[in-house]
Amino acid sequence: PVRSIFRKRRDVNVFMEQVQEIDVKNKRVLLSGRSPVDYDYLIIGLGMVNAYFGNNHWAKHSIGLKSLEEARKIRRKVLHAYERAEASDDPQERRRLMTSVVIGGGPTGVEMAGAISELTRRVFKNDFRSINPEESRVVLVEAADRILGTYSVESSNSALKNLEKLGVEVALNSPVKDVRAGEVELGDQTVKAESIIWTAGVEANPVLKTLPAEFDRQGRICVEADTSLPGYPEVFVIGDIANLTDIKGQKVPGVSPAAIQMGKHAAKIIKKELKANQSAPIESRNPFKYLDKGTMATIGRSKAVAEVAGMKFSGFIAWVLWLAVHLIFLVGFRNRAAVLLQWAYAYIGYRPGARVFDLPTSEVDILENERLQRAES
């Protein structure tokens, strides 16, 4: 809802374009579908993209979760797999279609595995006649010895127990050897699955490589204490693409609360300098200080883990905290009210989420050709 947020600000323009290059020397941003945009100040928050540790061919056989379109692909993939399983007479093919593999045991992977298991085992429970959704298989793959590695051991163990209660198979100490069409090869087994979801690795947006900057191993930009690009004080880099140790000596994590705080910090600097009608030396700018408001991950219905101000929560209380935080960060009262009502309906009726999906054009063409062939015969 970016346009609606700024609908009363006639001095704000919104462009839905792809950034091709950032020319900091000429203070210009090159876009894919329109003329370049010149700037006086620039805030870069392009975010991360999926990384496959040098195995880029894995991207063809798995779906990441870094964009809305990828989220839609996951929904389409899972729902269509069960429709195909319902129509199949082959038990092994049914088993494969009803198996989902989530690679990566971080917060995103844990939440995804729990959501798919609840959807397929409980929501689908009475929807099909030829298959039994309770026989669904969800495998969460993690190379380390525990999931939620950045959380405490207590929270990690709690999340593991809750996932197992939901029927999720958690494969620890299981680095991925290969991802092929319809299967994932681990150290000691090969899992055949229709839905393969990648949440294991990220790297900085490749557009950043056009910048004259120092990068870390993940491609993040090493920034100044005020989040500006070294040598270019009018350019700020925020969010998970910034490699920054704050004034307190703590590494700023690549999470949304940190990105929001960094954005506000950069905006205050810009506002102050515009008001003074001059740029200030970096040394006189206030350094960024990260306020850790805690971490949390939802696992399923009434199940979550949270660590806030040194306190650890799990179960229903942590789940309510997770809901509250996500409501707070929504824009506008109407959006908050609508989401709250949707959540309440889903919780009471156990009918979460929209289950309408469309097929990719290629699959639609295949089905149409099959229909025409049957008609001709």
Can you describe what each PLM-predicted range is?
Residues 1-41, 149-169:
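N-terminal Rossmann-like dinucleotide/flavin-binding domain of flavoprotein oxidoreductases
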Residues 12-101, 186, 197:
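FAD-binding core/adjacent interface of flavoenzyme oxidoreductases
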Residues 15-17, 172-174, 180, 239:
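Short loop/edge segments at beta-strand edges and connector loops
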Residues 32, 45-46, 174, 199-200, ...:
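Short, well-ordered coil/turn residues at beta-beta hairpins
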Residues 61-90, 182-185, 190-262, 268:
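FAD-site-proximal beta/loop scaffold in flavoenzymes
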Residues 96-100, 112-174:
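Rossmann-like dinucleotide-binding cores of NAD(P)H-dependent redox enzymes
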Residues 103-106:
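Glycine-rich Rossmann-fold phosphate-binding loop(s) that bind the pyrophosphate
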Residues 267-377:
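C-terminal, flexible cofactor-proximal segment of oxidoreductases
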